[in-house]
Amino acid sequence: MAALDGLPPLRDVIQRHGLDAKKALGQNFLLDLNITQKVARTAGDLTNATVFEVGPGPGGLTRALLALGAKKVIAIERDSRCLPALAEISDHYPGRLEVIEGDALKTDFEAMAPDGPVKIVANLPYNVGTQLLINWLMPRQWPPFWDSLTLMFQKEVGQRIVAEADDDHYGRLGVLCGWRTEAHMAFDLSPQAFTPPPKVTSTVVHLTPRPAPIPCEIAKLEKLTQAAFGQRRKMLRASLKPLGGEALLNRAEIDPSRRAETLSVEEFCRIANLL
């Protein structure tokens, strides 16, 4: 991509700006520009799209998104050390990159979303990735402000996102994602793709909103899944006792001797709607 966008190699950028990845910020920089292009392509057609990126670091994925035609990239970066490197990219793509120094967990993405297609594409910091995903699944208005999420996670988290009933990885995250989105794992990334290499394999997950999820109140579904999977090895009559236990399950026509990991998303919604 150096030839494609005329910007220097990322290793030169991080050396020039003294950007060592900080463990406290969950940083692992993705420096292979072929891989960043692959991630950006997984998000689909970027033409006319505004893309939110979280934790751009030295800007490898940012460059790919812009080179592949994103109308605008809004990058949220907490680490002020990365801002000069991102400013160089902004100079190269005038008017197409907006960098906001701040904490993504405290950012109101919906308030910043313009009219037109909106995608969220990010190599998420490991320590906040799951919470950010849950935040993006939670807007009361649905379909949401975003058209797709293309996100990098530890592979174990990716497996939990796409898991369905009777899968060992199935849990609260799988229910919430399965309820409101269609999700699939696009491809894996070895630790060697990152600097410094993490101890685990990473994966890229692509999620699109279901146009009409099963009607259900978010708060009730969250409360139910927390109780059910908080004691996942117990029968539902025991794990859901504080919420109504056997009587609740009988009303929902669910066998009280079943365990949480056997319930489909539809069955979870059926119980939640009775709370």
UniProtKB/Swiss-Prot annotation:
Keywords: Cytoplasm, Methyltransferase, RNA-binding, rRNA processing, S-adenosyl-L-methionine, Transferase. It catalyses: adenosine(1518)/adenosine(1519) in 16S rRNA + 4 S-adenosyl-L-methionine = N(6)-dimethyladenosine(1518)/N(6)-dimethyladenosine(1519) in 16S rRNA + 4 S-adenosyl-L-homocysteine + 4 H(+). GO terms for cellular component: cytosol. It is found in: Cytoplasm. SMART domains: rADc. One of its GO terms (molecular function) is RNA binding. Pfam families: RrnaAD (PF00398). Its EC number is 2.1.1.182. Belongs to the class I-like SAM-binding methyltransferase superfamily. rRNA adenine N(6)-methyltransferase family. RsmA subfamily. PANTHER family: DIMETHYLADENOSINE TRANSFERASE, DIMETHYLADENOSINE TRANSFERASE-RELATED. Specifically dimethylates two adjacent adenosines (A1518 and A1519) in the loop of a conserved hairpin near the 3'-end of 16S rRNA in the 30S particle. May play a critical role in biogenesis of 30S subunits. NCBIfam families: ksgA (TIGR00755). HAMAP family: 16SrRNA_methyltr_A. This is Ribosomal RNA small subunit methyltransferase A. It comes from Allorhizobium ampelinum (strain ATCC BAA-846 / DSM 112012 / S4).
